[in-house]
From Swiss-Prot:
Keyword Ribonucleoprotein: yes
HAMAP family xrefs: Ribosomal_uS12_B
GO MF terms held by the record: rRNA binding; structural constituent of ribosome; tRNA binding
Gene3D superfamilies: Nucleic acid-binding proteins
Protein name, as recorded: Small ribosomal subunit protein uS12
Entry GO CC: small ribosomal subunit
A Pfam family: Ribosom_S12_S23
Swiss-Prot/TrEMBL keywords: Methylation, Ribonucleoprotein, Ribosomal protein, RNA-binding, rRNA-binding, tRNA-binding
Function: With S4 and S5 plays an important role in translational accuracy. Interacts with and stabilizes bases of the 16S rRNA that are involved in tRNA selection in the A site and with the mRNA backbone. Located at the interface of the 30S and 50S subunits, it traverses the body of the 30S subunit contacting proteins on the other side and probably holding the rRNA structure together. The combined cluster of proteins S8, S12 and S17 appears to hold together the shoulder and platform of the 30S subunit.
Region Disordered: start-end pairs: 1-28, 104-124
UniProt entry tagged with the keyword tRNA-binding: yes
Subunit architecture: Part of the 30S ribosomal subunit. Contacts proteins S8 and S17. May interact with IF1 in the 30S initiation complex.
The gene coding this protein: rpsL
Organism of derivation: Synechococcus sp. (strain WH7803)
């Protein structure tokens, strides 16, 4: 416990909240260029080949972002838009690539949750 004199000299430091997505720099989305597109394996007990991309952002950061949905058209030098949101079973992946914007195509033949995957209304 500090004395009253110590508290007068230096007041208590309020703890600052640490951001979960520092590369966005308080923006909802950021644009970037893919430097590498590859697959990664998740932590135990899950097993899969998750599609991820290494992205160099306009904010100067280089981050790993997850590519959601079935199938994608991304390759090196593709321009993408990323948002926050981690993937629980992939360590170090704290961002998602937004489908249906810039060079990223939406998911084909998607009927449910279309807005999350950049899919247009299906033709009847």
């Amino acid at each position: 416990m500090p004395t009253i004199q110590q508290l007068i000299r230096t007041e208590r430091q309020s703890s600052k909240a640490k951001t979960k997505s520092p590369a966005l720099k308080s923006c909802p989305e950021r644009r970037g260029v893919c430097t590498r597109v590859y697959t990664s394996t998740p932590k135990k007990p899950n097993s899969a080949l998750r599609k991820v991309a290494r992205v160099r952002l306009t904010s100067g950061f280089e981050v790993t972002a997850y590519i959601g949905g079935i199938g994608h058209n991304l390759q090196e030098h593709s321009v993408v838009l990323i948002r926050g949101g981690r993937v629980k079973d992939l360590p170090g992946v704290r961002y998602h690539i937004i489908r249906g914007t810039l060079d990223t195509a939406g998911v084909k033949d998607r009927r449910q949750s279309r807005s999350k995957y950049g899919a247009k209304t299906p033709k009847e």
